[in-house]
């Protein structure tokens, strides 16, 4: 688990109250919590269930449902029943996560006093929108996939944790590691000498492409250009034709599947012999079926 840099985890007000209440209930002499009325404890969940990233979102949701069902059936905390408050930050208009919807979801969680913690969001752009709200509400969250390093960087604490305490945690590493490691792989293993860099305009895509590009240049790889894609566009022929004319050894794309699948399909037609690479945001069966 990766914790915010330079910070020590501190329990939020709600978590402290939950821990104290659970201890008191379990410790009351003569009371069998298994036979007492269960107190409902809610865990907020924010995922991109609508749009291009829905496949991963559904997988996470299903895993959470299984885990919390097992916890309830096994009386993980006697006297308490867990409920998931599942929210969707994806919209049909955006075709993927929508930061405005993510912010609305965060406000909903903070307003519900039964919500003691949160899981998510799935996407870094949603995380940037939610984190200040969760911080002000004293609600901690842990994300299974958001990797933008700025959110947990003390340098941006005023922006992303205005209340002071760190509330954003991860089960994954950040783009500060992922992007540079791909650049190292390009340089050391694939012997790439030149590369063109693209991103999908999202917080994750821009961040991971930035970190890749910085390390690629440090490793002596010549960056021939950098462009930002519109993830809603259907055709990337123009930019790929431009890249073809520059004859790079490799193409690096920072982003997720909404633009990535279309880009990969067209790239294999237009620049078939160019090495192609990208981040974990492209890990989806959609890439195999669509490209």
Identify the role of each PLM range.
Residues 30-36:
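Sec/Tat signal peptide C-region and signal peptidase I cleavage site
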């Amino acid at each position: 688990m990766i914790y915010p840099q330079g910070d020590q985890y501190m329990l939020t007000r709600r978590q402290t109250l939950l821990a104290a209440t659970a201890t008191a209930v379990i410790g009351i002499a003569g009371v069998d919590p298994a036979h007492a009325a269960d107190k409902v404890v809610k865990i907020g969940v924010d995922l991109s269930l609508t749009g291009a990233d829905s496949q991963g979102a559904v997988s996470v949701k299903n895993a959470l449902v299984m885990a919390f069902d097992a916890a309830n059936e096994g009386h993980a905390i006697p006297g308490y029943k867990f409920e998931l408050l599942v929210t969707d930050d994806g919209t049909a208009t955006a075709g993927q996560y929508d930061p405005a919807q993510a912010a609305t979801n965060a406000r909903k969680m903070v307003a519900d006093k039964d919500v003691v913690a949160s899981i998510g969001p799935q996407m870094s752009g949603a995380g940037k929108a939610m984190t200040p709200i969760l911080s002000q509400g004293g609600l901690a969250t842990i994300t299974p996939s958001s990797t933008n390093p700025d959110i947990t960087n003390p340098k941006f604490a005023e922006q992303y944790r205005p209340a002071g305490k760190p509330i954003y945690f991860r089960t994954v590493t950040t783009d500060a590691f992922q992007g540079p490691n791909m650049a190292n792989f390009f340089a050391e293993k694939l012997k790439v000498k030149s590369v063109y860099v693209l991103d999908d305009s999202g917080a994750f895509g821009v961040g991971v492409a930035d970190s890749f590009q910085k390390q690629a240049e440090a490793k002596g790889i010549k960056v021939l250009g950098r462009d930002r894609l519109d993830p809603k566009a259907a055709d990337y022929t123009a930019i790929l034709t431009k890249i073809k004319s520059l004859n790079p050894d490799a193409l690096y794309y920072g982003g997720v599947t909404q633009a990535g699948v279309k880009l990969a399909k067209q790239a294999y037609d237009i620049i078939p012999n160019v090495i192609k690479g990208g981040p974990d945001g492209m890990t989806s069966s959609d890439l195999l079926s669509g490209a």
